[in-house]
Amino acid sequence: MCQRRYVDDILKRFAMDECKAVVSPVDMSTRLVPSDAATKVNAPFREAVGALMHLMTATRPDIAYAVGYVSRFMENPQEEHWVAVKRIFRYLQGTKTHGICFKPGNKIDFRGYSDADWAGDLADRKSASGYTFLLMSAPVN
């Protein structure tokens, strides 16, 4: 299952259809922090994050961490938060054909995995956790 057309549509909607691809959805050398600045970024931040959430829940669990990370800044997005969203778009540019694959003949099994990062957020020491379930070796959440 793949949503290449949807990826093309959202890249075009946010003027990222000709962007250069990157190999990961998050730049781990950049730490985003909340801002109390009165001005917000002049970009469709919430609309973009919503479009990414739809894609994430349907066929792209590989962007779940990145989308969850940028969604923390929905209340008062700043330029650096918008840059992080655009990085996810750049990752999608290079992985348009990625999706979930159910192969015929796979044994019907169901597995679950989880992980946690305790107090890993440098701004407020909040913890993060995540999980995924595999059905016939394909992620379903």
Regions picked out by a protein language model, each given a short descriptive name:
Residues 1-141:
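Long, low-complexity, charge-biased intrinsically disordered regions
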